[in-house]
């Protein structure tokens, strides 16, 4: 069943060549979200994977990680923690800077977002360089969380992000992968 669902999701993801810049193929999840049956299939893949695990929270990475992360938190009867871009949270925060191709970026979470020992599932839509996900893992761990697994819809392993996540010791689950030639 899960293999079929994963293939349905993969086939529904739109590939947009040369966006946002020439030479890049953007993997667009909006067709998955727009079709209720495919969106349900995607959510079910994650729910079936995590429904028997002892989890306390789902953390979602800004911004598309909020979409899937909040739905999973609801379906699994867990709380949700947003990992935001710098300057978007109103309360005291802890921050982690990470490198981009041409500069740096920062993500933040509230200082009271997790308690020591809480078991957290970290969710985003896509793994490319892995920088944002690794920064989110570090933030959660700094606050004492146990990041049980990082999860995403799409992995682009040829860019190397999944390897960077593996180097943190955090397991990674993705629904599908795309190669540079897909």
From Swiss-Prot:
CDD domains documented for this protein: PRTases_typeI
Main location (coarse class): cytoplasm
Cellular-component GO terms for this entry: cytoplasm
Pathway assigned in UniProt: Purine metabolism; AMP biosynthesis via salvage pathway; AMP from adenine: step 1/1
Entry-linked PROSITE patterns: PUR_PYR_PR_TRANSFER
Disulfide bonds: none
Keywords: Cytoplasm, Glycosyltransferase, Purine salvage, Transferase
InterPro entries named among the record's database cross-references: Ade_phspho_trans, PRibTrfase_dom, PRTase-like, UPRTase/APRTase
Top-level lineage group: Bacteria
Transmembrane segments: none
Recorded catalytic activity of this chain's protein: AMP + diphosphate = 5-phospho-alpha-D-ribose 1-diphosphate + adenine
Gene3D superfamilies: 3.40.50.2020
A GO MF label: adenine binding
EC number: 2.4.2.7
Location of the protein in the cell: Cytoplasm
Any single GO BP term: AMP salvage
Functional summary from the UniProt entry: Catalyzes a salvage reaction resulting in the formation of AMP, that is energically less costly than de novo synthesis.
Subunit: Homodimer.
Similarity remark: Belongs to the purine/pyrimidine phosphoribosyltransferase family.
Name of the protein: Adenine phosphoribosyltransferase
Organism per entry: Bordetella avium (strain 197N)
Gene (UniProt): apt
């Amino acid at each position: 069943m899960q293999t079929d669902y994963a293939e349905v999701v993969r086939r529904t993801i739109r590939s947009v060549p040369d966006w946002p810049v020439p030479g890049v193929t953007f993997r667009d999840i909006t067709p998955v979200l727009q079709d209720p049956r495919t969106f349900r299939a995607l959510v079910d893949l994650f729910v079936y994977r995590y429904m028997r695990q002892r989890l306390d929270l789902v953390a979602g990475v800004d911004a598309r990680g909020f979409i899937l992360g909040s739905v999973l938190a609801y379906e699994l009867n867990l709380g949700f923690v947003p990992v935001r871009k710098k300057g978007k949270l109103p309360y005291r925060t802890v921050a982690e800077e990470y490198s981009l191709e041409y500069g740096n970026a920062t993500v933040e979470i509230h200082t009271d977002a997790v308690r020591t020992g809480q078991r957290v599932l970290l969710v985003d839509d896509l793994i490319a360089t892995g920088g944002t996900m690794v920064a989110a893992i570090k933030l959660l761990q700094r606050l004492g969380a146990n990041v049980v697994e990082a999860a995403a819809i799409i992995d682009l392993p040829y860019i190397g992000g999944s390897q960077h996540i593996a180097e943190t010791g955090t397991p990674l689950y993705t629904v599908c992968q795309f190669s540079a030639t897909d």
